[in-house]
């Protein structure tokens, strides 16, 4: 799955179960990949300006590649939260990268 992403310095979400930074993807883009097998998701607590005590579904993917220009980085066992499609409406990106992945 190839998509545009945005580094968000305000995305400080860390998975409390595995201690890894969490990036957010448009849920509708990711779910078709899991047609036959339901992904194993867990609920992560989060707080934001709009939601003080929220929960978001997240999963761990084997690898995530981040490409900037000619440089490419591989993140193993990356944690991805499943964001609401409305979060990405009228945006030029489909994923919000955690600032700790810079």
PLM features: what roles do these ranges have?
Residues 1-102:
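Pepsin/retropepsin-fold aspartyl endopeptidases
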């Amino acid at each position: 799955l190839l998509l545009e992403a945005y580094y968000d310095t305000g995305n400080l979400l860390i998975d409390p179960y595995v201690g890894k930074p969490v990036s957010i993807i448009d849920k509708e883009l990711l779910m078709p990949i899991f047609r036959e097998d339901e992904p194993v998701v867990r609920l992560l607590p989060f707080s934001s300006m709009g939601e003080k005590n929220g929960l978001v579904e997240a999963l761990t993917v084997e690898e995530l590649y981040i490409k900037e220009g000619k440089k490419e980085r591989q993140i193993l066992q990356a944690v991805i939260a499943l964001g609401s499609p409305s979060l990405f409406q009228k945006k030029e990106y489909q994923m919000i990268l955690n600032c700790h992945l810079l």
